[in-house]
């Protein structure tokens, strides 16, 4: 069964405490922390996500799954490492060189944080292959990063299939996380393509019954 990481990007501030408490007991596996710097993507969620991460550390037993959509990856790793997340994922596209990307991987390893690397919809999946021996997870964006509530891009399903095939053929122990536009209508397609983790935000947050939606997402 796949795992579900709930994006709290669109949790309303005035309902945050109750919403996060209800999510905690709904059957999710992770809280997905969407960190945006206003540069790598147009929105800036840094302060909101720092606050949510600190709050979740105090009230939740669930692991944090931090997704950095930022240019200055190193400083953001340091900012969010203090919350002891299970995973921090950075974008391949943010790296200016192989050496820089390997430096970020080393920094995460030194902090005992699982390493995730993400690719945008227009990035070829082959570009991530050389890093598979060094990471725990590849996050495939199934929408353009930067905003919640978008529709899943169908072409990204093939990318997940290709990645899954390559991982299996080379016996890598790497999970695939799919993020963007995932709901109960398309989750089965994403699961069948080979995703191990589904990120879902709006589909869960806007539902009346979180538990029911999460059961359907997990299949």
Regions found by a protein language model. Give the residues of each.
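Glycine-rich phosphate-binding active-site loops on the catalytic face of alpha/beta enzymes
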Residues: 88-96, 139-150, 193-214
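Alpha-helix-loop-beta-strand connector modules within alpha/beta enzyme cores
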Residues: 46-66, 107-116, 156-176, 180, ...
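Glycine/small-residue-rich loop that forms an oxyanion/phosphate-binding "nest" at active or ligand-binding sites
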Residues: 45-102, 117
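Active-site beta-loop-alpha junctions enriched in small/polar residues
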Residues: 7-11, 36-38, 69-73, 93-95, ...
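Hydrophobic faces of well-ordered beta-strands that scaffold small-molecule active sites
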Residues: 2-7, 31-33, 64-68, 88-90, ...
């Amino acid at each position: 069964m796949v795992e579900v990481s709930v994006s709290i990007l669109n949790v309303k501030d005035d309902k945050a405490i109750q919403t996060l408490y209800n999510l905690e007991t709904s059957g999710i596996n992770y809280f997905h922390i969407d960190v945006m710097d206003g540069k790598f993507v147009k929105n800036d969620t840094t302060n909101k996500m720092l606050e949510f991460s600190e709050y979740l550390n105090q009230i939740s037993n669930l692991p944090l799954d931090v997704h950095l959509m930022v240019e200055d990856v190193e400083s953001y790793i340091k900012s969010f490492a203090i919350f002891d997340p299970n995973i921090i994922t950075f974008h391949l596209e943010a790296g200016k060189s192989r050496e820089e990307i390997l430096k970020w991987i080393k920094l995460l390893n030194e902090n005992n944080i699982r390493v995730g690397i993400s690719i945008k919809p227009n990035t070829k999946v082959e570009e991530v292959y050389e890093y598979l021996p060094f990471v725990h997870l590849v996050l495939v964006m199934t929408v353009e990063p930067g905003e919640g509530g978008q529709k899943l891009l169908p072409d990204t399903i093939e990318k997940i299939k290709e990645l899954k095939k390559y991982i299996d053929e080379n016996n890598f122990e790497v999970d695939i996380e799919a993020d963007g536009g995932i709901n109960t209508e398309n989750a089965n397609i994403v699961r069948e393509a080979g995703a191990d983790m589904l990120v879902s935000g709006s589909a869960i947050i806007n539902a009346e019954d979180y538990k029911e939606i999460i059961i359907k997402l997990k299949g």
